[in-house]
Amino acid sequence: MPTTLMLLPCMLLLLLTAAAVAVGGTRLPLEVFEITPTTSTADKHKSLQYTVVYDAKDISGAAAATGVASSTVKPATEQLTVVSISSTAAAEKDLAESRRHARQMLQKQQQHRSIIGGKHGDRDVRILYQVGDSEEDLPVCAPNAVCSKIDLYETPWIERQCRCPESNRMPNNVIIHHHSHSSGSVDSLKYRNYYEREKMMQHKRMLLGEFQDKKFESLHMKKLMQKLGAVYEDDLDHLDQSPDYNDALPYAEVQDNEFPRGSAHMRHSGHRGSKEPATTFIGGCPSSLGVEDGHTIADKTRHYKMCQPVHKLPVCTHFRDYTWTLTTAAELNVTEQIVHCRCPRNSVTYLTKREPIGNGSPGYRYLFACSPLTRLRCQRKQPCKLFTVRKRQEFLDEVNINSLCQCPKGHRCPSHHTQSGVIAGESFLEDNIQTYSGYCMAND
């Protein structure tokens, strides 16, 4: 007995240590858990046979059990209560008045939210940090790194990955040429002349010494500013017409899909339309929920924001090029996502390879490639979509979606793991992950 009491504190210490390691360990990104029919769960998904939950026998048995239970219970004797008719009418009137007042208050709240929803919608987005709880705790982004990840599955929320360098913290990094303006004050003309002579013509004076060849100076400055990362508005229309141009909405042209359709294309840095709102930044990283800022790569239900404009990235080749790599560092408890190229239109990403970092580091590097959208028709009792759901400590559901096949005509695939036609699958308790299989449902 004394020996057991002496060993009890040691056992408690080991349990606490294991719990601390489990909580404080490196949390892998959910994109790493790509559970598809090509993995070890292929046979389970292929041979999956589900029966009707409420069978006729179960219903009849339940009704019989209910009847037996109800026949054995005797009703309790109730005493008659004399109620005044006038008091009952007054109570009903007060209840109706309170309900009417509650409906009016609810309508006022809804009108207030609809009015201010467009103005302050982005302010209500929850912001999480993969390290610490402020911008100062985040590392500085590497070249072509993802600075923020926006989840649009349910309520939008942002996970900050890193801080953009100071050289990239220019919200409108686009040069607008000074065209001839007929209307303008003398002060503005003086400012333009001073700006051109003291700033734009500085390199010209060093090369030629005189203000003579304006065409040469403009070309020289244009190439110099392009090397610094600026984008000229004259080049935007030319890039828009490229056949390899990515519209960042791969599901917009797919038939019978549940994703929102839209005609928005991936714009470039600072190139905004007349009706598009100004881009907001957090730590130098764009934080708007749309793809019009030119720094966004859309994949499934996530938007990946970058410090650099995405049009500078080359276009990937299906199944051959790695679109991005996820590197986990256990000692720093951070994950770095580096984008190498952008997927073509109507493409999705998938996990293709995992390799150790090397150099004695315990982390891994996950490689992702591009794949065209599946055109295979779903067979009978075959899941059309797989949901991988992880419960986070911030009381959020992080969900990854894998489309397995296309539902036949007249059917739809569930878009949420809580909708009808979705059945719970395998669980991974060590990673706090639950999988769900979605099946085709007939349209109402």
Swiss-Prot record:
Disulfide bonds join 141-162, 147-285, 164-307, 316-341, 343-370, 378-405, 384-413, 407-440. It is found in: Secreted. Gene3D superfamilies: 2.20.20.150, 2.20.20.160. Residues 1-24 form the signal peptide. GO terms for biological process: anterior/posterior axis specification; dorsal/ventral axis specification; eye development; eye-antennal disc morphogenesis; genital disc development; haltere development; imaginal disc-derived wing morphogenesis; imaginal disc-derived wing vein specification. Pfam families: Argos (PF11581). During embryogenesis, expression is in a segmental pattern in the ectoderm and in the nervous system. In the eye imaginal disks, expression in photoreceptor cells begins a few rows posterior to the morphogenetic furrow. Also expressed in the wing disk. In the adult, expression is seen in the retina and lamina. Glycans are attached at residue 333. Two-fingered domain 1 part repeats lie at residues 123-165, 285-307. It comes from the Eukaryota. Keywords: Developmental protein, Disulfide bond, Glycoprotein, Repeat, Secreted, Sensory transduction, Signal, Vision. GO terms for molecular function: epidermal growth factor receptor binding; identical protein binding; receptor antagonist activity. Two-fingered domain repeats lie at residues 316-370, 378-444. GO terms for cellular component: extracellular space. Interacts with spi. Regulates cell determination; development of ommatidia and optic lobe. Is a signaling molecule involved in the process of axon pathfinding in the eye. Part of the Ras pathway regulating programmed cell death in pupal eyes; activated by lozenge (lz). Antagonist for the Egfr receptor (gurken). Inhibits Egfr signaling without interacting directly with the receptor, but instead by sequestering the Egfr-activating ligand spitz (spi). The three two-fingered repeats tightly encircle spi, providing the basis for it's sequestration. The first repeat harbors a 120 AA insert specific to drosophilidae. This is Protein giant-lens. It comes from Drosophila melanogaster (Fruit fly). The gene is aos.
